[in-house]
Amino acid sequence: MYSDKKNILQLVALLKAHGVRKIVLCPGSRNAAIVHTLANIEDFTCYSVTDERSAGFFAIGLSLQGGGPAAVCCTSGSALLNLHPAVAEAFYQQVPLIVISADRPAAWIGQMDGQTLPQPHVFGTLVKMSVNLPEVHTEEDEWFCNRLINEAILETTHHGKGPVHINVPISEPIYRFTAKTLPEVRVITRYQGLSVYDRDYKELIERLNKYNKRMVVVGQMNLIYLFEKKYVKPLYKHFAWLTEHLGNQTIPGIPIKNFDAAVYSMTPERQEDMAPEILITYGGHIVSKQLKKYLRNHPPREHWHVAADGKIADLYGCLTTVIEMDPFEFLEKIAFLLDNKPTHYPLMWENYCKTIPMPDLAYSEISVIGKLIRALPEPCALHLANSSTVRYAQLFTVPPQVEICCNRGVNGIEGSLSTAIGYAAASSKLNFIIIGDLSFFYDMNALWNQNYGANIRILLLNNEGGEIFHTLPGMDKSSRSREFITAEHYTTAKGWAEERGFIYMKVTGEEELEEAMQPFTSPETRMQPMLLEVFTDKEKDTTLLREYYHGLKNKNE
């Protein structure tokens, strides 16, 4: 019988699954549940060593002799500090070592309870990774716990070998051993390249070929990659390709970009039917909340993330494999290894998404964004500020020769204008910037320098506050909400824009917009940058947005 603590069960099951076999066990009360469970697994060879300082070096010897990582488990408090010399040796000798420490719950650290000290990250820079496991009470806790353990074990041999530290908080009661079996756990694997000299990848291709519903989701990529013609058809026909404008031209063919609205419109039955069996991802962040929710609720059997840095990014909660290589090299490598069995899955997605209409709304924030996007000259660069701007732009088709930029690393509203101005300063193309009022005024000092030219066209959407916050569930429109959440204001950019040498234009309605859009989007060279400030009504903006999405829901009823 094993401990009933789920974080312990996850840890032990993953040590076993990752092939860790040699474990040094130090006596103690707080770690007794871990020790008891480890000692009762036949796959492990356990060694009892009382002195933790000696135990750490003993574990180094085990690892050196076997090649794979060995583990050492100790109780809480100063016992852990006694492993420090061995951890330092393992780090500088590059020996894979897993240090497992039991701990009290965080609430009792520093409260004069016995045998306690702040254990997370106690080894500082002398370990490759340090993780503090959650105590598992929810499904999300269990997913988080599983991910942390996978990350730590994989890190022992990633880009060189070395020690890692796994800290395991354990609440009372500690000594309940009621679990009859170890749980079935998700094991994350890593391929460092696809080379027969590094790791046999035939098994990987066999896994890929057994699925019919294959999807690729591409996140933000600040580049353009044109696939050679010979790769385009073999790759394109086998997958449903989804990306956003921020993915730019990084797909072998024409991708599906309106999937956010499409997923929102689907019935539960259609969502289930169109869910992928395997998901491959590359690139950075995805804006779509609908896609994140969809793939978390309908997880594929496998999720492979392809990234040159090999880091674990489990956005959809179902990651199974990390492939550490350039994503384009990966795709070109597998292109001719894919089987030729017919699949209708890509067409299912293409045909359904073609039924989703673009917004055709009255004068509003969304309609203004759509009008500019349709009028963009090619080639040019389009910079999208965060919050509503980047989301609403996704509802429209962007011309193919338009490069898209956005600060989606942390997704804050600050710095959107400064980043765009900096980009334009080194660009020979026209640079269009769509930005909301809060983001613009927050970053208005972006124009307080001399390092920009006439190739800048700023579309400032001013509805006197952050209207997107009123679309959030539970947000009322009281005076307090308007003041503290929407941050209502009555500011205009006119004086600042003209002071900084911009041609300023003001729009308050559809006719003025039509008149201003032609000079604003003209590719003709001008002597000054331009700022077009468009005023809309935030109540109308949110109402029209809701009506559009309500119409999508009704299309299948």
UniProtKB/Swiss-Prot annotation:
As its record notes, the protein acts as a catalyst of: isochorismate + 2-oxoglutarate + H(+) = 5-enolpyruvoyl-6-hydroxy-2-succinyl-cyclohex-3-ene-1-carboxylate + CO2
Q: How is the cofactor bound?
A: Binds 1 thiamine pyrophosphate per subunit.
GO BP terms, alphabetized = menaquinone biosynthetic process
Q: Which InterPro entries match?
A: MenaQ_synth_MenD, THDP-binding, Thiamin_PyroP_enz_TPP-bd_dom
Keyword rRNA-binding found: no
Molecular functions (GO terms): 2-succinyl-5-enolpyruvyl-6-hydroxy-3-cyclohexene-1-carboxylic-acid synthase activity; magnesium ion binding; manganese ion binding; thiamine pyrophosphate binding
Q: Does the keyword Cell cycle apply?
A: no
Q: Which UniProt keywords apply?
A: Magnesium, Manganese, Menaquinone biosynthesis, Metal-binding, Thiamine pyrophosphate, Transferase
What Enzyme Commission number(s) appear in the record?
2.2.1.9
Q: What cofactors are annotated for this protein?
A: Mg(2+); Mn(2+); thiamine diphosphate
Q: Name one Pfam family in it.
A: TPP_enzyme_N
Superkingdom field: Bacteria
This protein's pathway? Quinol/quinone metabolism; 1,4-dihydroxy-2-naphthoate biosynthesis; 1,4-dihydroxy-2-naphthoate from chorismate: step 2/7; Quinol/quinone metabolism; menaquinone biosynthesis
For this protein, the record's NCBIfam families field holds: menD (TIGR00173)
Name the protein family: Belongs to the TPP enzyme family. MenD subfamily.
Q: What does this protein do?
A: Catalyzes the thiamine diphosphate-dependent decarboxylation of 2-oxoglutarate and the subsequent addition of the resulting succinic semialdehyde-thiamine pyrophosphate anion to isochorismate to yield 2-succinyl-5-enolpyruvyl-6-hydroxy-3-cyclohexene-1-carboxylate (SEPHCHC).
How is the quaternary structure described? Homodimer.
> PANTHER family in the record, alphabetically?
2-SUCCINYL-5-ENOLPYRUVYL-6-HYDROXY-3-CYCLOHEXENE-1-CARBOXYLATE SYNTHASE, PROTEIN PHYLLO, CHLOROPLASTIC
Q: What is this protein called?
A: 2-succinyl-5-enolpyruvyl-6-hydroxy-3-cyclohexene-1-carboxylate synthase
List the source organism: Phocaeicola vulgatus (strain ATCC 8482 / DSM 1447 / JCM 5826 / CCUG 4940 / NBRC 14291 / NCTC 11154) (Bacteroides vulgatus)
Q: Which gene encodes it?
A: menD
